[in-house]
Amino acid sequence: MQVILLDKVANLGSLGDQVNVKAGYARNFLVPQGKAVPATKKNVEFFEARRAELEAKLADVLAAAEARATKINELVSVTISSKAGDEGKLFGSIGTRDIADAVTAAGVEVAKSEVRLPNGVLRTAGEHEVHFQVHSDVFAKLNVVVVPEA
């Protein structure tokens, strides 16, 4: 099935590309998510007329994501306290939701889906590097310091 992409899609293409995908992928994912429209003559003409508007909108979203990534990088570190044993091993773990809440409390709005933990959840006290994927092309890093509670 031929579709026109309205957004950048990983491993498929970027805005304006006409790609051939399986019908189920288009019907169940791309079209409902607003990432593509079927490539009919009417849709091709409509897209070409609105191409500049869509590209400007995509550029605005990218600029906003880069601004948020800069704010995250400027934070340098965020401290989270959690109950821990004698050797610094946490009772439980610190996951994406806890990190997103701590960063949001520090002043930068972050969703838990944007937090990337390359080594899994944090289970020990100390300093950990956490990655954020704010946009498909924009990444940020932040040090999270886990301190044991008394």
Swiss-Prot record:
Superkingdom classification of source: Bacteria
Spans traversing the lipid bilayer: none
InterPro entries documented for this protein: Ribosomal_bL9, Ribosomal_bL9/RNase_H1_N, Ribosomal_bL9_bac/chp, Ribosomal_bL9_C, Ribosomal_bL9_C_sf, Ribosomal_bL9_N, Ribosomal_bL9_N_sf
Record keywords, A-Z: Ribonucleoprotein, Ribosomal protein, RNA-binding, rRNA-binding
One Gene Ontology term of the molecular function aspect: structural constituent of ribosome
GO biological process: one example: translation
SUPFAM superfamilies: L9 N-domain-like, Ribosomal protein L9 C-domain
GO CC annotation terms, alphabetical: ribonucleoprotein complex; ribosome
Family statement drawn from the similarity comment of this UniProt entry: Belongs to the bacterial ribosomal protein bL9 family.
Role: Binds to the 23S rRNA.
HAMAP family (UniProt xref): Ribosomal_bL9
PANTHER family to which the protein is assigned, alphabetical: 50S RIBOSOMAL PROTEIN L9
Record-given protein name: Large ribosomal subunit protein bL9
Organism of this sequence: Yersinia pestis (strain Pestoides F)
